[in-house]
Amino acid sequence: MKISKTISALILSFILILGSFGTANAKRLTAAVADWTGGEITCQVAVSMLEEELGYKVKRVVFPSGTGLWEAIAAGEIDFACESWPSYAEADTVMMKGPLVYDGETMFNYEGDGSVKLLGTSGIIGLSDYYIPRYAAESLGIKSWEDLNKHKAKFATIETGKRGRLLACPVAGWNCHDQKRLDLLGIDFQADELGTEAAAVAEAVAAYKRQEPFLLYLWEPHWFFGAYDMVGVGLPEHKVCDPDTFTEAGNWKDCGTKGWPATGWAKD
């Protein structure tokens, strides 16, 4: 029996469900390692349990998140992904079928074709926001995202001109849509995608050491907050944009609900 077309939101649920395949003939699996730090740790734990406790041999492949990953799982080229943030995976709505449940509460019902299966969640709750150093928040008097425009010059660079700069969600394939969110909220900042989590964090660390103001997309839990004193600007809660008005053809300008794009829940 081959475990295929399967994705786990987070590892613990994956391991528990995988245990039911204990009599499987095929003992080799291919795992997609997420391209962010937490995902790498998640996969290390999952693979260790599969190999040391269940006798599988697991080949790990670093695979960028996004639609391509889901398609590879659906095609059987990859057996499972160790971790996925569901509200950042736009392909899930067409590939998964069934409820997404957190703490006994149904957050979303997928109505896709079922080519990718969600095995469950581990109970880890993630939160994404835009963060600034506490020293900048206190010196500039920034208490929420609504205060950012008043001080955008402090966050501007030669490349952004008069606009402030956001060290954005670094990978386009993560589908964060930071520039769309900034524009919908009227925040006059430019989202700068640096390509990797490491690059974005390195630039933030350098700015912190220089005691410069900067705005950073990041998520919790993350090791960065244990090393540096940061404050979230408190982005608004998730709202679903009207699919008839919030379109690529319309340059994603009209959300229909005056909210931010459907890419981040308070709980993820």
Q: PLM features: residue spans?
A:
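Flexible, solvent-exposed loop/hinge segments that line or gate ligand/substrate-binding clefts
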Residues: 87, 97-117, 181-185, 191-268
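Short, polar/charged alpha-helical segment
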Residues: 37-56, 180-182
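N-terminal segment of the mature folded domain
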Residues: 66-131
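Short helix-initiation/N-cap motifs at beta->coil->alpha
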Residues: 36-37, 57-71, 192-203
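Short, well-ordered beta-strand elements
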Residues: 26-38, 56-62, 163-167
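A conserved helix-loop-strand patch within extracytoplasmic ligand-binding domains
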Residues: 106-166
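Bacterial N-terminal signal peptides that target proteins for export
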Residues: 1-11
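Bacterial N-terminal signal peptides
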Residues: 9-19
